[in-house]
Amino acid sequence: MADTGTPEDILPGRFRDWFSARGWRPRAHQLELTQAALAGDSALLIAPTGGGKTLAGFLASLIELSAAPRSRPALHTLYISPLKALAVDVQRNLMQPAEEIGLDLRIESRTGDTPAAARQRQRKSPPDILLTTPEQLALFIASANAASFFADLRCVIIDEIHAIAPGKRGDLLALGLASLAEWAPDCRFIGLSATVREPGELANWLDLRPGCAAPRTIRAAGGARADLSILVSRERI
């Protein structure tokens, strides 16, 4: 019998309904990355600004968390941003679709501005999704009980990876990723970028675990269509 399914079939019904309610359709690169991530594969997504790459990075995590809610607090997805302001912004933007889809998730950020009380609570009761920076991750990894905190980690998302990987910040983060790979061997690594000069090198930097296939490189066909209008004044300005 011929396969009559569509690429969108990898999305559960309530996810498809969420896209449809907004007059959207998931883009090909979003579905391709979601499929790779659900298979446990690491990947590098190259998509222009407005291409929906941030949502693409999180879709598989949201699907997994919707299908199998955790019986105890445990970190599922770690998002790493070059800027603390971006981490906080993505946290806010991610909470809206999660709530609209009907997911009961804890999505929190951990930056230099996070109060000490919130940091302590996160250690004792990890959120489902944590958004942070390379420096905050390095501090966390160097702390006691870090291995147990990250043991259940399933996904690491590195946003604007082209801005982090080169230089000292990239070296610092690479050490952190090596620790995460050791503590959570089933974890996948997702890199997001709008522009990459050497995608092969960056993909290899993303996941260097021996015996693992090289991360897949996924390229978006194009960004969102611009919605432009011209305002013409009848009077002289």
What are these regions (language model features)?
Residues 130, 134-138, 142-189:
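SF2 helicase catalytic motif II
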Residues 2-46:
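Conserved pre-motif I regulatory segment
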Residues 48-51, 63-90, 103, 182-186:
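Conserved SF1/SF2 helicase motif Ia
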